[in-house]
């Protein structure tokens, strides 16, 4: 159980009305934070995990840098206005990508209505602040926030047909504006983009690679690694696969040994590199192999 300090209980903004001195399960507070944007629950969790709210914020800033959020600095854990507290839509999207890696987040983010039972027996209703959970087909996560200074904000995610999109809206004029704008972004993305499978691990490469000093004259090659790109519909032909392969390879080789690579080029810019490996093993050529090469296999059959 997590103890609730006076500091946590005294948080303004969205809250679940925690009582100072009560203790609640960690999962209850986490759910309150994800579903109800509860600032008091957020501070209570931070104090529990790191000993103080400030140490929690310090760790948030460290993690932001680890995630590449170069234009973000946290002064508090709640998002309430403070000097030096800032972020960008791109950084919020990066943070959302990280959140999507955690199944527990999805478990709570899709809850529409719930409640918190306090130690005293008092009950606080929880309503998901992300209306798109109910109103937009495929939306299964997101976080809202609003202050006079920042306006109405949301980072939401939706998935259709195996393609997941993230929409970030900052500074909307009203709550409905942020939801409408995010929904419009999703509509545009799903209508105009698709996932294009560029490479599949294990796919054979056309032709074979000559082998020097091996018991086989050549071997098959295959790709090692999957690559799928999010592309505007109708632009798939702009992707090029440019091989970087030697004229031959030297035996011996095990299956899976690196041989070369394939560059993935989009509009003249290299965006990825996929390893090319041996699709079969080849040993060194022995005396009998040499004779077979010279005189023909019929002598040994």
Give each language-model segment a name:
Residues 70, 81-86, 90-301:
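Domain-terminus/edge residues, biased toward the C-terminal soluble/receptor-binding domains
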Residues 1-90, 94-103:
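Active-site-adjacent loops and short helices of periplasmic peptidoglycan-processing enzymes
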